[in-house]
Amino acid sequence: MFEQRVNSDVLTVATVNSQDQVTQKPLRDSVKQALKNYFAQLNGQDVNDLYELVLAEVEQPLLDMVMQYTRGNQTRAAQMMGINRGTLRKKLK
């Protein structure tokens, strides 16, 4: 049997190539590619609040999945995320 080890320091994204092989790449590589695509579509236009845009795209799925993983346990979710439970509650509203 294959043993799958999880490196808790690196988030990965599974991708399927043209030969139907599944590969893992760091999430940061996917973020870089998404930003390259975004900048290419700007055609020289100025952009404001890019930091907020990226955080909004990442934060909500993070909250959703952590809450699902902890089965709604806010204390455990806050501990997993390394934030105060009160902060988590505000973000969930």
Swiss-Prot record:
One of its GO terms (biological process) is regulation of DNA-templated transcription. The keyword Thylakoid does not apply. It comes from the Bacteria. The keyword Transmembrane does not apply. Keywords: Activator, DNA-binding, Transcription, Transcription regulation. Residues 74-93 bind DNA. Signal peptide: none annotated. SUPFAM superfamilies: Homeodomain-like (SSF46689). Disulfide bonds: none annotated. InterPro entries: Fis_DNA-bd (IPR005412), Homeodomain-like_sf (IPR009057), HTH_Fis (IPR002197), Trans_regulatory_Fis (IPR050207). Belongs to the transcriptional regulatory Fis family. Homodimer. Activates ribosomal RNA transcription. Plays a direct role in upstream activation of rRNA promoters. This is DNA-binding protein Fis. It comes from Proteus vulgaris. The gene is fis.
